[in-house]
Amino acid sequence: YQNRNGKPFSWDDVFPGYSKLTPQARSAYFLRDDLTDTEISSLKDYGADMSLYLPSGNEARLKAAYAQRDPRLAATVILPYSTYVGGSTGAALTYTSRHPYRRDTAPELDLQTRYTTRMYYWMRKFVARGTECQASEYTGIDMPVFRYADVLLCLAEALNEQGRTPEAIGYVNKVRDRAGVAELDSNTWTAVEGQDDLRQRIIDEKHWEFAGESGTLYEDELRWGVWHQRRFLGSAPGEQSEAGLKQVWGENVAPYIYAGDYCYRWAVPQS
């Protein structure tokens, strides 16, 4: 996700030299305040560069890094040190996503997940809160199949492919206005440089808008021919990709493996 003003986000702008660090070393930026000596020792063994750690300001510094991002990021996932109202005890309690995890009881009320030794971006979108549902296997939240935002972006794509790019921009901006981000053509970062540029911006917009949804994004990726690059970062068939299940600081815990280009076209039954 970009910044709210349309500027591309880079961790290097927040923490200079971030991308040159190993994922383990830069995990220090994501740690909770007031670590114990035991926690610090364990994190050093993991590879965290504790010279980067602020004992009493680490959480606030990290939260500030997310403050100006596209609001759809925080609406889609639970960000580090943000809260989530859970109901696992039978009562609605406010938990905070922290690392390392300690306990989900007072006074900490850390968000307990399936993997308490790791820190992921857990889903927030369409996840029940508090005591809205009695089991994680089902929810009363209706999952949209086709949203109005998709109608607008499909229309924008069709108009752009017809060469009606200025008209198409208006429909993309309807989605961006609702999301609370800068309109296209409103500043240097959002300036549209023609049909090809808007085509890519529509692809990006659909990913930001529909992340984590069960709508048409997968079919769109196949249709655009970007599924291999978007999901597997262009890795060769059978090889581990740089994409995968990652901790928030980028450690790839479970790399994806691309099966091959045949996935783009399903076989036609011969009988």
Features from the language model and the residues they span:
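Charged/polar interaction segments and conserved charged motifs
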Residues: 57-72, 76-79, 86, 108-117, ...
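Extended, hydrophobic/aromatic-rich amphipathic alpha-helical segments that build helical scaffolds
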Residues: 65-69, 73-78, 122, 142-177, ...
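Active-site beta-strand/loop architecture of penicillin-binding DD-peptidases
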Residues: 106-147
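Generic hydrophobic, helix-prone segments enriched in Leu/Val/Ile
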Residues: 1, 32, 117, 122-123, ...
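Boundary/linker segments of alpha-helical solenoid repeat arrays
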Residues: 182-186
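Long, intrinsically disordered, low-complexity segments
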Residues: 1-21, 107, 135-145, 169-172, ...
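A short linear-motif detector with a strong N-terminal bias
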Residues: 50-55, 131, 188-189
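An aromatic- and glycine-enriched ligand-binding surface/loop that stacks and positions planar moieties
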Residues: 1-103, 229-236
